[in-house]
């Protein structure tokens, strides 16, 4: 059953939802459990979320829907809500409502006492307001017990309680127990104390619509095989969202949870299991798959994979949970709570993409630094250095810096920048395309690390090289100059759309979601390999 029957009264004159948007709204309205709206970028998920909140309110499925959106998109969402439903009663947690702790408390009070068609809140503020302390402690105790069982199972399977896997699990268990004890003993965070006496359950919110839901993918999975590359511990905001979803289900509103994302699985197969934990735990339990070990046994395979070493000087074989099995059964389970749309389904008018790798020869200086990374990695693996002093994640990060320019490394601030490295290669490509695209003011994006204040940084170096190659300085901008100010960001993006700014530099995070500057876009230059596959979407 599609959504063609929806009349959507109240929508602005001249605005029409596309068929797939109505179908998604209708699917979520009919659902008894949560709904994952996994629609490709550009399919119109914002309007889907807005229409879902208003239709749920109109039809009596919800009385106070809350939309949780990335911080920098709050104003954009508010504008889209009013564009779609000009007469809607909307409450938005904008910058003014976050001015100080007292203004935040006042905002939550308005949520609780008002009759709203939609409440729009930024991710960060949403995650600071928790369910009741009693509920949190109960859920934290359950997670500690899960780790304890995983430790016991791992020690039994390995026959050695000193095994590295057992140690990792035990460390995760202790961390979870410490967090639980701090909360029990009244050692709350500053944010918790600022919101003392306000609980999520007291707001009257009976529907959650979460935009860019993959931001909440980091739910830990306590498993005895902790050496498979799975994340053990959860991010605090993910545990918080899980608590709220569980409360909504207990209150009889389990069908009023909708997640929206274009990348439901961005980095690990366990993310699909976590989506089911959020949205369809009842189905998991009915199938006997409510533990990750059971789910992985049914749908996954552990296979040897060849991976590049973190230090970048060779390859290693690792056992990873990296292949699905029983795919028909898995897809059937996923379809029960997922509305999926790909570009093949709706044929968005996208330009043909040409991906061009730009090889840059390694310098002797970079080779020396890479050899040092190899030595550091050996010391880390041998346990010869405390994790807080050095670890494989730090080594990988330093490798990225070396590839861009060794001058970014700590202690190398006084080195000369590379003359013919990635930055110079990028500058030459940007300048060439700038010249070719001048007749129609074609624009370009440069994705790299964050510009530092004071001293040398890669952004300013790239800009200086572009100016030296003939690109006017006034046509080059850093997205970070606009900060988190939505008005300044929109002013900057308007200049890019008009062609006044021809080169915009920024990080994946800053130039990703919500950056609508594609009208004149001729090229994107990625100087850093992104951490996650989803960052290439």
Residue ranges and their predicted role:
Residues 48, 61-90, 97, 123-128, ...:
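Conserved Walker A/P-loop ATP-binding site and its immediately adjacent core
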Residues 36, 40-43, 48-79, 251-255:
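Conserved SF1/SF2 helicase motif Ia
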Residues 126-133, 202, 216-217, 267-269, ...:
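SF2 helicase motor core recognition
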Residues 22-28, 244-247:
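Pre-Walker A adenine-sensing motif
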Residues 2-19, 29-33, 48-53, 57-63, ...:
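Conserved Helicase C-terminal RecA-like lobe
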Residues 72-75, 97-99, 124-127, 214-215, ...:
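Conserved nucleotide-binding/hydrolysis micro-motifs of P-loop NTPases
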Residues 105-150, 164-167, 171-174, 178-207, ...:
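Inter-lobe coupling linker of SF2 helicases/translocases
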């Amino acid at each position: 059953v599609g959504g063609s029957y929806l009349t959507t009264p109240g929508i602005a004159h001249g605005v029409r939802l596309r068929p797939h948007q109505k179908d998604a709204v209708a699917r979520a309205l009919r659902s008894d459990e949560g709904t994952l709206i996994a629609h490709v970028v550009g399919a119109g998920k914002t309007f889907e979320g807005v229409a879902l909140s208003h239709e749920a309110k109109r039809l009596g499925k919800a009385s106070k829907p809350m939309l949780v959106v990335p911080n920098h998109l709050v104003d954009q969402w508010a504008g889209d809500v009013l564009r779609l439903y000009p007469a809607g009663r909307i409450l938005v947690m904008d910058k003014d409502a976050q001015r100080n702790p007292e203004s935040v408390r006042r905002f939550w009070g308005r949520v609780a006492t008002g009759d709203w068609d939609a409440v729009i809140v930024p991710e960060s503020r949403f995650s600071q307001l928790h369910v009741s302390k009693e509920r949190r402690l109960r859920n934290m105790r359950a997670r500690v017990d899960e780790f304890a069982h995983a430790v016991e199972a791992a020690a039994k399977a390995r026959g050695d309680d000193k095994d590295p896997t057992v140690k990792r699990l035990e460390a995760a268990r202790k961390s979870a127990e410490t967090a639980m004890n701090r909360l029990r003993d009244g050692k709350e965070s500053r944010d918790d104390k600022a919101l003392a006496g306000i609980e999520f359950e007291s707001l009257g919110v009976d529907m959650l619509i979460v935009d860019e839901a993959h931001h909440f993918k980091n739910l830990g999975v306590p498993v005895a095989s902790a050496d498979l590359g799975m994340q053990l511990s959860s991010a605090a905001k993910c545990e918080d969202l899980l608590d709220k979803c569980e409360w909504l289900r207990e209150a009889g509103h389990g069908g009023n949870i909708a997640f929206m994302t274009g990348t439901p699985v961005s980095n690990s197969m366990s993310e699909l299991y976590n989506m089911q934990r959020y949205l369809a735990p009842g189905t998991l339990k009915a199938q006997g798959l409510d533990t990750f070990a059971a789910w992985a046994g049914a749908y996954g395979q552990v296979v040897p994979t060849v991976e590049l070493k973190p230090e970048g000087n060779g390859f290693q074989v690792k056992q990873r949970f990296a292949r699905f099995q029983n795919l028909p059964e898995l897809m059937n389970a996923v379809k029960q709570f997922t509305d999926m749309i790909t570009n093949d389904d709706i044929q968005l008018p996208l330009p043909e993409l040409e991906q061009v790798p730009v090889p840059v020869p390694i310098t002797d200086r970079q080779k020396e630094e890479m050899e040092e990374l190899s030595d550091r990695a050996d010391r880390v693996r041998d346990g010869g250095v405390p994790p807080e002093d050095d670890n494989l994640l730090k080594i990988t990060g330093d490798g990225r810096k070396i590839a861009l320019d060794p001058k970014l490394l700590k202690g190398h601030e006084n080195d000369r920048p590379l003359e013919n490295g990635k930055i110079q290669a990028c500058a030459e490509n940007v300048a060439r395309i700038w010249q070719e695209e001048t007749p129609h003011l074609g624009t370009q994006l440069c994705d790299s690390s964050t510009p530092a204040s004071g001293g040398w940084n890669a952004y300013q170096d790239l800009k200086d090289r572009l100016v030296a190659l003939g690109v006017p300085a006034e046509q080059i901008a850093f997205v970070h100059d606009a900060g988190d100010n939505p008005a300044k960001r929109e002013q900057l993006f308007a200049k890019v759309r008009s062609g006044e700014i021809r080169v915009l530099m920024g990080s994946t995070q800053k130039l990703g979601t919500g950056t609508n500057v594609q009208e004149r876009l001729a090229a994107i230059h990625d100087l850093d390999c992104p951490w996650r596959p989803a960052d290439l979407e």
